[in-house]
Amino acid sequence: MSCGDKIRIAIVVSEFNYDVTRVMEEKAIDHARFLGAEVSLVARSPGTFDTPFIVSRLLATHSEVDAVAVLGAVIKGDTKHDEVVAHQAARKLLDLSIEYGKPVTLGIIGPGASRLEAIERAEEYARRAVESAVKLARRSKELSGEC
């Protein structure tokens, strides 16, 4: 791959809190196009906690993907469940990035976010996750001598 080739990203979207993540998905795709990247695959996960499994399968079977942006919204409830979900997903996503040698970026709102806060943050988190994925993929190619 030359430096002029497009970066190919995959987007993994949690279906839980879909009123928020649907907006995130749309904004992420728009921002990837703006950055000149190709969204080669959009995969859905039942919830944020499940995203590492989807990312693992995706990276194991789609070698053409340069990076993955993960989108989710973990809304605060009456217990600390939101903290467990967000922290465990984040930790495992980082592990997968290291394991596969490909960027996996975190566009997960929460823990501790209200529904209103999640709605307000949706576009920003989606854009930041995609931008990080594209930048990291480019830098990875530079470091590996592909550019």
From Swiss-Prot:
Q: In which pathway does it act?
A: Cofactor biosynthesis; riboflavin biosynthesis; riboflavin from 2-hydroxy-3-oxobutyl phosphate and 5-amino-6-(D-ribitylamino)uracil: step 1/2
Active site: residue positions? 81
Query: Which Gene Ontology cellular component terms are annotated?
Result: riboflavin synthase complex
Which parts of the sequence bind 5-amino-6-(D-ribitylamino)uracil? 16, 48-50, 73-75, 106
Which residues are connected by disulfide bridges in this protein? none
- Function, as annotated: Catalyzes the formation of 6,7-dimethyl-8-ribityllumazine by condensation of 5-amino-6-(D-ribitylamino)uracil with 3,4-dihydroxy-2-butanone 4-phosphate. This is the penultimate step in the biosynthesis of riboflavin.
* Pfam families per UniProt: DMRL_synthase (PF00885)
Q: What is the lineage of its organism?
A: Archaea, Thermoproteota, Thermoprotei, Desulfurococcales, Desulfurococcaceae
Which of this chain's residues are annotated to bind (2S)-2-hydroxy-3-oxobutyl phosphate? 78-79, 121
A GO BP entry is: riboflavin biosynthetic process
State what protein this is by name: 6,7-dimethyl-8-ribityllumazine synthase
